[in-house]
């Protein structure tokens, strides 16, 4: 048999602070011009558990909303916005200070009611830390391995073996 790859293309649209353009605007223009069957959007995510940080790869058929995990809501890369199917792939690479405190004190917090937990966490975390997001010091190496894993998965998904 003979192997053949589907025709694919890729772009790294950057972030609005770098480009001055919404990622969705860039992708909408490309979609309008190239008319793909599907868009695969890959993004970093904010973890809601320190256990998931750099350890999971999330896949969805509902797209991605860039910046939403860190409170920087942008226009989503969704089928509704792009008029084409969108597969979202995300890896939690950052975590906020509240999640770190919550996970570190989980056993104590389990003894409290939900409203008490929230009050406790609000008192424990200084106001300027509410917008602090951190990433592990080995994030560059980890992203290299995770991106290889994702790229190999995509390569296998796009392979077409004909006999």
Predicted features along the sequence, with ranges:
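Short, flexible loop segments at boundaries between secondary-structure elements
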Residues: 69-92
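Glycine-rich phosphate-binding loop
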Residues: 24-75
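Short beta-strand segments
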Residues: 11-12, 41-43, 88-92
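Glycine-rich phosphate/diphosphate-binding loop of Rossmann-like nucleotide-binding domains
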Residues: 1-10
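Short, catalytically relevant binding-site loops at active-site mouths
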Residues: 16-17, 45-48, 93-95
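C-terminal functional extensions of proteins
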Residues: 89-163
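Short glycine-/polar-rich loops that comprise or flank the Walker A/P-loop
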Residues: 6, 35-37, 82-86
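Conserved active-site and cofactor/substrate-binding residues in soluble primary-metabolism enzymes
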Residues: 18, 22-26, 34, 137, ...
């Amino acid at each position: 048999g003979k192997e053949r790859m589907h025709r694919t293309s890729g772009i790294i649209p950057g972030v609005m602070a770098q480009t001055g353009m919404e990622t969705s605007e860039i992708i909408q223009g490309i979609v309008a011009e190239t008319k793909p069957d599907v868009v695969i959007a890959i993004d970093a995510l904010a973890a809601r558990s320190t256990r998931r940080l750099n350890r999971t790869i999330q896949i969805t058929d509902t797209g991605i909303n860039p910046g939403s995990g860190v409170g920087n809501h942008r226009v989503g890369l969704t089928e509704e916005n792009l008029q084409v199917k969108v597969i979202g792939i995300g890896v939690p690479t950052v975590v906020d200070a509240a999640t770190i405190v919550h996970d570190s004190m989980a056993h104590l917090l389990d003894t409290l009611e939900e409203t008490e937990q929230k009050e406790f966490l609000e008192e424990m975390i200084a106001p300027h830390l509410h917008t602090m997001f951190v990433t592990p010091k080995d994030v560059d190496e980890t992203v290299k391995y995770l991106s290889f894993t994702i790229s190999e998965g995509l390569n296998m998904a796009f392979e077409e073996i004909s006999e």
